[in-house]
């Protein structure tokens, strides 16, 4: 009887470990990317909360006229 309980405990630990590995591999987070070019601003994989929206709203595409070289 003790061997059966020991075997059940090992199986339970293995099943829980496999479930944990699968669930963590399914939850992949991509980094937030804000790409600013001369023509546009692209937002990729970003969580759009109020703070992020306010920050993005003030961005403008890069232009040579606004750049200053000293």
UniProtKB/Swiss-Prot annotation:
Cytoplasmic side: 28-70
Domain of life according to the entry: Viruses
GO cellular component: host cell endoplasmic reticulum membrane; membrane
Chain ranges on the Lumenal side, renumbered to this chain: 1-6
Pfam families, per database record: TGBp3
InterPro entries in the record: TGBp3 (IPR003411)
GO BP of this protein: transport of virus in host, cell to cell
Transmembrane spans: 7-27
Cellular compartment(s): Host endoplasmic reticulum membrane
UniProt keywords, alphabetically: Host endoplasmic reticulum, Host membrane, Membrane, Transmembrane, Transmembrane helix, Transport, Viral movement protein
Reported function: Plays a role in viral cell-to-cell propagation, by facilitating genome transport to neighboring plant cells through plasmosdesmata. May induce the formation of granular vesicles derived from the Endoplasmic reticulum, which align on actin filaments.
Protein family: Belongs to the Tymovirales TGBp3 protein family.
Additional notes on this entry: TGBp1, TGBp2 and TGBp3 seem to act together for cell-to-cell propagation. TGBp1 is the main movement protein that physically cross the plasmodesma with the viral genome. TGBp2 and TGBp3 would facilitate TGBp1 function.
Name of this chain's protein: Movement protein TGBp3
Species this protein is from: Potato virus X (PVX)
């Amino acid at each position: 009887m003790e061997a059966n309980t020991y075997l059940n405990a090992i199986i339970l630990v293995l099943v829980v470990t496999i479930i944990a590995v699968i669930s963590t591999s399914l939850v992949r987070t991509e980094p937030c990317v804000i790409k600013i070019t001369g023509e546009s601003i692209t937002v990729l994989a970003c969580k759009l909360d109020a703070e992020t929206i306010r920050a993005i709203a003030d961005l403008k595409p890069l232009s040579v006229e606004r750049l200053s070289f000293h």
